[in-house]
UniProtKB/Swiss-Prot annotation:
Deubiquitinating enzyme involved in various processes such as centrosome duplication, cellular migration and beta-2 adrenergic receptor/ADRB2 recycling. Involved in regulation of centrosome duplication by mediating deubiquitination of CCP110 in S and G2/M phase, leading to stabilize CCP110 during the period which centrioles duplicate and elongate. Involved in cell migration via its interaction with intracellular domain of ROBO1, leading to regulate the Slit signaling. Residues 261-315, 397-436 are annotated as: Disordered. It catalyses: Thiol-dependent hydrolysis of ester, thioester, amide, peptide and isopeptide bonds formed by the C-terminal Gly of ubiquitin (a 76-residue protein attached to proteins as an intracellular targeting signal). Ubiquitinated via a VHL-dependent pathway for proteasomal degradation. Residues 421-436 have a biased composition (Basic residues). It comes from Mus musculus (Mouse). Keywords: Cytoplasm, Cytoskeleton, Endocytosis, Hydrolase, Metal-binding, Phosphoprotein, Protease, Repeat, Thiol protease, Ubl conjugation, Ubl conjugation pathway, Zinc, Zinc-finger. Residues 154-682 form the USP domain. Belongs to the peptidase C19 family. USP20/USP33 subfamily. This is Ubiquitin carboxyl-terminal hydrolase 33.
Length: 909
């Protein structure tokens, strides 16, 4: 949004008006229909006091403007001004009385007799006053510290073979986007889920980066919380640093994720009869790690992906009704079309997977099949592309075998958005819009990337394209033969990433000793003595190299319905802000484990990933600088982890060895045996922009409007190379107000910016929406009260019915209910989950035999009374009914009489 100040010729007709006048008018009603707010409009014409309703009612404000030629009006809820004659929003440089200053607000340095107090506007009395942004909020580089006083140089004590955790935590701690989020937006680390890992991590980051710089701290609380969730890390045995990283980031994502509502437009080229597999947000998925495309790992992952464990205690399960399902389908259709339109191809959905298409050369007419893989479904959507050139198909022909993280995965999408996720809010389109539920967190914002992979059948030329979200790249370390193929430019030899396994060899204590000898000798002997040097670019090239699918690793073509020879490879569609690279040094077999100790050369600056970028990718920055590296010394069965990290405040490298922190040279880091590397996008332009905005904040001019902006987005602006469009939706509801649940800590969510800063940020990054006034949403408050009343009523009725059921001596009928669904319902009525569950789903506990529904043996089910079942079923619907009837034993009256006689005789004795 650009600024329209002094471009509206009707500003001269505005009369003098004070904030008290606007507040008084906002408490009134429309002068014609008597309807009350919100969203009343006040006429700004000189000596006109008219107040009318907006478009949500009869729109008397527009009628008043047409009849009286009074063109300027102000929304009494948002304080935004609209000119009917110019048909645009205008910004006032004068006319509104200067409001009094707000107390207890940070003030930046005053220059040219201008203070921050000139920019404040009155806040909602029910909300705490947000702080005004200062230079430190916009530019991390203003925190110039002396080298001897640099923060972040605090060690971590080893509390029982926990060097793997200490190295991982130090590596994450030196990732500025994540650490700065917890330091600047610590108020957002809120969760009702146990064991509240985000709060323990916040406390740890505060201690590590405190100005007092303690020598070392003990991460006991964080470690205890992780052990509670993941039993893998219990005990005192050595664990894997990368697995710990995955577990920690999964837990942080689960606790910090927020549901985001996006408006999606329905593509005009699609009809309602076309069906597409249901899609959910990729950020709700437990993050994946892109593994190398070896045949053995591919088979292992495919076999392991058929069934996933479910965390029924904490996981929010979203069961969509038919309308939600249609919205998800339409959303997915648009994502497919966005990708196809980028390839300049015509799109036509075909429901018949086995449609016979004429197969010709790739340079002429080609049929490409886009597979949308849903983990909860095996349905596949076929999208046929016509006139697709070879250059648009082959560069993305590689399938990636995802390796799931340590924590239980959730169902989710393999289709992150191909188009920019944030668009300027404009209502000019006449297309029907859909709402789509999406989840995001600071973890997904920082570490999520997208890989586009494809497999081509060499018989029918069908190409299967898949998009997958990754959190880290697991790269193979190529051997001598692989390096020769990679470095050969005379012939396009296909390099198989899986062949790197030949570099493994059994190791023992002798190898442990020889490793240190070799490390010393390597530094003294020329590299040609040991053979070719393996670089990180070689590992990336091996990962992204084309791979033949033949022999035991043939491709199962769905068009041919047979195993066929194929070729696969992949490219990156979207690079993350911080790229986590895992070098596959360990291989764990059934009887033994091995380790590759090959030195991999990696750059400290200027890692160029352009060769691995998809041609149609919108990515602009593909150069990365190293932040930290985790190293492992020893063998696969024993060893020690350390981390080398670059301090962001003084740009010096340090070795973090448990509680010991030592400055090291760059050459020491480059000679390290890297295991996990963290690279950050590099952008001089972003640093210049931060300095420019920071300088503007110190010399800002007075303005009458103050803008509120998300702290989370400001953290992105402060630490990201590509912060993306401004997003204020993290503190706004869908109605434009403050959600009642966030009202108590609104000061932790937003900062105030003067108008000139907002204009500069908005003109460069777009996004929004613009917010000039904070108020608690009345509509959300009513909905919240309704949902709380519903929770209370359902819980009370269930307790009463269940108590009556427990008092029955011998109930004739039991109704079985899925405990998975019941846990979701229990989380809802107890206030742990904001959304009610979907329909009752007993399909997992039911089995049909001889035409009747019976309880499946060993099913995770509970027993309730018929009255309780009818109560829940009347609210949520679903089924099927699973009824248990205890067998009735018929006793012969003569036998019963004889037993009673014996009992009487026994008592008489």
């Amino acid at each position: 949004m650009t600024t329209f100040r002094n471009h509206c010729p009707h500003l001269d007709s505005v009369g003098e008006i004070t904030k008290e006048d606007l507040i008084q008018k906002s408490l009134g009603a429309c002068q014609d229909c008597k309807v009350r707010g919100p969203n009343l409009w006040a006429c700004l014409e000189n000596r006109c006091s008219y107040v009318g309703c907006g478009e949500s009612q009869v729109d008397h404000s527009t009628i008043h403007s047409q009849e009286t030629k009074h063109y300027l009006t102000v929304n009494l809820t948002t304080l935004r001004v609209w000119c009917y004659a110019c048909s645009k929003e205008v910004f006032l440089d004068r006319k509104l009385g200067t409001p009094p200053s707000l107390p207890h607000v940070r003030q930046p340095q005053q220059t040219q007799e201008n203070s921050v107090q000139d920019f404040k506007i009155p806040s909602n009395p029910a909300l705490k006053t947000p702080m005004v942004a200062v230079s430190e909020d916009l530019d991390i580089e203003v925190e110039e510290e002396d080298e001897l006083k640099a923060r972040g140089l605090t060690g971590l004590k080893n509390i029982g073979n926990t060097c793997y955790m200490n190295a991982a935590l130090q590596a994450l701690s030196n990732c500025p986007p994540l650490t700065q989020f917890f330091l600047d937006c610590g108020g957002l680390a809120r969760t009702d889920k146990k064991p509240a890992i985000c709060k323990s991590y916040l406390k740890l980051m505060t201690e590590l980066w405190h100005k007092s710089r303690p020598g070392s701290v003990v991460p006991a609380n964080l470690f205890q919380g992780i052990k509670t969730v993941n039993p893998t890390f219990r005990g005192y045995s050595q664990q894997d640093a990368q697995e710990f990283l995955r577990c920690l980031m999964d837990l942080l994502h689960e606790e910090l994720k927020e549901q985001v509502m996006e408006m999606e437009e329905e593509p005009q080229t699609l009809t309602s009869e076309e069906t597409v597999e249901e899609e959910k947000s990729q950020s709700d998925v437990d993050f994946q790690s892109c593994e190398s495309c070896s045949s053995s790992e591919k088979a292992e992952n495919e076999s392991g992906s058929k069934g996933f464990p479910e965390d029924s205690n904490e996981t929010t399960m979203l069961i969509q009704d038919e309308d939600d399902l249609e919205m998800a389908k339409d959303w997915q259709k648009e994502k497919v079309c966005n990708k196809i339109n980028k390839a300049n191809a015509d799109v036509e959905l075909d429901k018949d997977r086995d449609t016979v298409c004429e197969t010709v050369d790739l340079n002429s007419q080609e049929t490409v099949k886009v597979q949308i893989h849903g983990r909860a479904s095996e349905s596949i959507t076929d999208v046929h592309l016509n006139d697709l050139a070879t250059s648009q198909i082959l560069p993305s022909n590689e399938s990636v075998s995802p390796r799931l993280s340590a924590s239980p995965p959730k169902l989710g999408s393999l289709w992150p958005g191909l188009s920019p996720p944030h668009k300027k809010a404009q209502s000019t389109s006449a297309k029907r819009k859909k709402q789509h539920k999406k989840y995001r967190s600071v973890i997904s914002d920082i570490f999520d990337g997208t890989v586009i992979s494809s497999v081509q059948c060499l018989t029918c030329d069908r190409v299967s394209i898949t998009l997958e979200t990754f959190q880290d790249l697991s790269l193979p370390i190529p051997g001598k033969e692989d390096l020769a193929k990679l470095h050969s430019s005379s012939h396009p030899t296909i390099v198989k990433a899986g062949s790197c396994g030949e570099a493994y060899a059994p190791q023992g204590w002798i190898a442990f000793f020889m490793e240190y000898v070799k490390r010393f000798v390597v530094s003294c002997v020329p590299s040609w003595f040991w053979g070719p040097v393996v670089t990180l670019q070689d590992c990336l090239a091996a990962f992204f190299a084309r791979d033949e699918l033949k022999g035991d690793n043939m491709y199962s073509c769905e068009k041919c319905k047979k195993l066929r020879n194929g070729v696969k490879f992949c490219k990156v569609q979207k690079f993350p802000e911080i790229l986590c690279i895992h070098l596959k040094r360990f291989r764990h077999e059934l009887m033994f484990s091995t380790k590759i100790s090959t030195h991999v050369s990696f750059p400290l600056e200027g890692l160029d990933l352009q060769p691995f970028l998809a041609k149609d990718s919108p990515a602009q920055i593909v150069t990365y600088d190293l932040l930290s590296v985790i190293c492992h010394h020893g063998t696969a069965s024993s060893g020690h982890y350390i981390a080398y990290c670059r301090n962001n405040l003084n740009n010096l490298w340090y070795e973090f060895d448990d509680q010991s922190v030592t400055e090291v040279s760059e050459s020491t880091v480059q000679n390290a045996e890297a295991y996990v590397l963290f690279y950050r996008k590099s952008s001089e332009e972003a640093q210049k922009e931060r300095r420019r905005i920071s300088n503007l904040l110190n010399i800002m001019e007075p303005s009458l409007l103050q803008f509120y902006i998300s702290r989370q987005w400001l953290n992105k602006f402060k630490t990201f190379a590509e912060p993306g469009p401004i997003s204020n939706n993290d503190f706004l509801c869908i109605h434009g107000g403050i959600p009642p649940r966030k009202a108590s800590y609104i000061e932790d969510l937003v900062l105030m910016l003067p108008q000139n800063i907002w204009d500069n940020l908005y003109s460069r990054y777009g996004g929004g929406p613009a917010v000039n006034h904070l108020y608690i949403c009345h509509t959300c408050q009513i909905e919240l009260e309704k949902i709380e009343k519903r929770r209370k009523t359902e819980l009370e009725i269930f307790i009463r019915l269940n108590r009556a059921f427990q008092e029955e001596d011998s109930p004739a009928t039991f109704y079985c209910i899925s405990m998975q669904w019941f846990r979701e319902w229990e989380s809802f009525v107890k206030g742990k989950d904001g959304d009610p569950p979907g329909p009752i789903d007993n399909t997992k506990i039911a089995v049909t035999k001889c035409g009747s529904v019976m309880l499946k043996q060993g099913a995770d089910s509970g027993q309730i009374s018929e009255e309780t079942w009818n109560f829940l079923q009347s609210i949520y619907g679903g089924g099927p009914e699973v009824i248990l009837r205890p067998p009735v034993v018929h006793v012969d009256p003569d036998v019963l009489q004889a037993e009673e006689k014996i009992e009487v005789e026994t008592r008489s004795l």
